[in-house]
Amino acid sequence: VYPHQNPGIGPNKYNFDENVRYELHVSLGSDIPLGRPTVTYRFEFQTKFKSQKTLLQSYLGVIQNIDDAAQNLTQTYTITKIDNRLGTTSQIGTGIVPPNNQGNATPFYNEGDNGENPARKGVATAAELDKYTRQAIFTFPNGYTAFAGQRDDGFVGDIQSIFDLLKLRNPGQDAQGGFNLHLMALRVPRSELGGDQQTVGVFATTSRLMMPVSNSNGRGILDLIRRPTWVQVARQGNPLFNE
């Protein structure tokens, strides 16, 4: 979510929205042609401040470990599994969102563990990941692994040529190169999807709480009344084909 995050936005910071349900839907068997979710994995986020008596909203100093005293604004998340075949809901686990890359406040994201250097390049193994990312990969019972946080946008597409120029360029250009996004990743056991060599459908949705406006108090003042009803506001399937 939140693509095209400019790394050089200074003190501004992107966060997950705690008023949004982020859901990953998996369709199996006869649910695939209907686009109907067989199993849904829901991410919900909570935001906490260690201190509200400061102008330094996000960081109070150099962060040595995720969720330490210097990471003032900290987000946690809960992952819930909804099995629509059985009508059951179960909690998979909870995790912590690592800090965004903020230069000197988060030095371990950068080359040589120096916040003034460029960000580390991509790696091939988990052992090569930076310290914050390693700490933010959570393993849960029954074979689940999850991560949620800021990452380099891995989607490659020549957006300008497709939408602006209406023709393909050779060679193409990576329109997302150098920009970040907020990623939610969940590894599930193959047995949960029916084993090896399965055809599955996957799509994602975001939903918000319905928030109607009412001025029934008779004082000419608009009141926001939050109802416990979730409304889907976005759906993402195959990028550039079903969005």
Regions found by a protein language model. Give the residues of each.
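Surface-exposed extracytoplasmic segments
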Residues: 1-243
